Amino acid sequence: MGIEVVVLLTTLMLDAAVGEPPALLHPVVWYGKLISLLERAKFRKMLVEIFYGAFCCLIVITFALILSLLPFPYPLNFLWAVYLLFSSISVKSMVNHARVCVESGVDRKAVQMIVSRNTEELSEEQLCSAVIESVAENYVDGVVAPLFYFSIFGVAGAVVYRAVNTCDAMVGYRKGRYEAFGKFAARLDDILNYIPARLSLLFFELLKRGAFSYGLKRNVKLNGCAIAAMSYLLGVKLEKPGYYSLPGIEPSAADIERAIKAFVRLTVIAVIFTTIAVSIRIVLLTKLHF
């Protein structure tokens, strides 16, 4: 068994036990603080703002890459690799956040913790929809994408992806103050998510036949096919008022629980896929070496 497979399995056990690192020691928090610090500079010309935003995003990416390449001796290098991959995925923390929403009676403040839209304007069904959509999106951002890049580039791939994803989450807005500054981060995140988002549809297909084609046809945004697939899998209406509406029955708190169970099953599938992909890469690299 290759060392990267051991890193992956150890990471998953750590995630199941802990959930996520404390904020002070969380690399994703570091990326967020760094981009927040850099974005304070303002420029009047949009083109200059776009290039400066790209420069800042590249600084965060470089910082993340340096973290993944720090030359620790064994076994510290193994532990560091586990920690970085652990901080790049989000399984238990997503499950916990979604369950808090259910246990609170789908309270607006609880839902606001995991979505960017204004929950004060949403009905109870729309609040449930927002949570389910968040679970579906996190399956791509917090599971499939980091594991996909880990399977190709090792820990560095997962870490760099997470840095880009964090920049997008912080400043990658299509409108408002970050429209120019966050353009590069938003576009780069779209590019990096393109394959993982569609790969996730294959995993949905294993749970319900037809999910792959439905996700492609009903893609609510560039990489929102997992939302469409989750709607199809659960048979519920998922909507973001003013943006998209997927047909189905009105969602309830019980459907959030169903989404959580589906998320866990889909994560197991993604882990199996990643283990196989990493093993194949190791075998191919070994043959090329000899």
From Swiss-Prot:
InterPro entries: Cobalamin_biosynth_CobD/CbiB (IPR004485). Signal peptide: none annotated. Its main location: membrane. Keywords: Cell membrane, Cobalamin biosynthesis, Membrane, Transmembrane, Transmembrane helix. The chain crosses the membrane at residues 5-25, 50-70, 71-91, 140-160, 266-286. It holds the Pfam family CobD_Cbib. Pathway: Cofactor biosynthesis; adenosylcobalamin biosynthesis. GO terms for molecular function: ABC-type vitamin B12 transporter activity; threonine-phosphate decarboxylase activity. One of its GO terms (biological process) is cobalamin biosynthetic process. It is a multi-pass membrane protein. One of its GO terms (cellular component) is plasma membrane. It is found in: Cell membrane. Belongs to the CobD/CbiB family. Converts cobyric acid to cobinamide by the addition of aminopropanol on the F carboxylic group. This is Probable cobalamin biosynthesis protein CobD. It comes from Archaeoglobus fulgidus (strain ATCC 49558 / DSM 4304 / JCM 9628 / NBRC 100126 / VC-16). The gene is cobD.
